[in-house]
Amino acid sequence: MGMQLSDIDLLNLDRFTEGVPHDWFTYLREHAPVYRHPEPGSPGFWVLTKHADVTLVGKDGRTFSSDQANGGVVPIEDISPANDADFGDAKLMLMTDPPEHTRKRKLVNHGFTPRMISRMEDHIRELTTELLDGTIAKGECDFVVEVAAELPLLVIAELIGVPVEDRHKIFEWSNRMVGSQDPEYLTDSDKVLEAQVEMFMYAGALAEERRKEPRDDIMTALLTAEVDGDRMSDMDFNLFFMLLSVAGNETTRNAISHGMHAFLENPDQYQALVDDPSLIDSATEEIVRWASPVMYFRRNATDDVEIRGQQIKAGDKLSIWYASANRDEEVFEDPFRFDIRRDPNPHIGFGGGGPHFCLGANLARMEIRVLFEELVRRVPRVESLGPADRLRSNFIAGIKHLPVRFHSTA
């Protein structure tokens, strides 16, 4: 007997420890691309799995709200007020709609200019070179912990002025907040809120220091930015620090981890990059498509709307699944093949445009590109020493551990 809709349970986190359930998404794209998924104690939520629909909803912030008051972007389940942090009137930028989101985004854009990001490439390459040389010399490593997690932490520390020796505080805070349903990081809601408080206190101290001693860096640019007489409040800055520390760390870490895992499973593609390093730009885009590190975002309908014949009512919850959209057979030829020459590659691994397009997309691309450029330059072959250990989450497509051996000769 074949698969049925009743077999699909996207709230079963244990299933995600085996990998992204692409068999479920393939079935949904074909048989129920807009599907009302059951949820205990609620009317359920809509699951959108097609590239076109995910893109449509992601771009229409008026009809499909990200506002925290309407449920925010994550999780699918509604959060009890007792387990939610109280930020007063301030909200994470991800959890706002225009015009508030537009205001926040304009302020933040003062720090994330192309000039600011491009200025970092030489330094990111230095950090990458030092990191890889030390790790490769050992011969074997846990690629996630020692490489994929380290580089974004080093970059974020540089970006927002965190002393290098404090970078693992970000790693710990991030794991507590994103991995709270994984046995390795398992913690209760109090610990998640504790991590938020610790991050806010740390961000506040950094901001105070930078106001006293401004520098030509992104943090100073953010704190001094002014748009239409509006400046970033202390709470806005704290929330942005948290967003950058968690989102900027987790997504890049997992894109790099999935990239390495894909190369291990497709050694011909790694060899192709060794032989022709000019493929690095298309390889970077394929890594992001393949990884889809953020599997879904949630939205809430503000109006009645119809999608593919399904009647979605105002107030209904929707989940838009990037992990599925990036394997859509109507958009990608042979979507389950990891192909570093893929062209075109209209993936939506960074959100697919719209108001919530990933602010750090260019920085993430740079980190992925530089790391694999420098890796293939040094190591002609990488060997897997064991399976990928995956995060217990239906939100972040995370790999926690990936043991590898580096071979200096092919």
Residue spans for each PLM region:
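Cytochrome P450
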Residues: 1-410
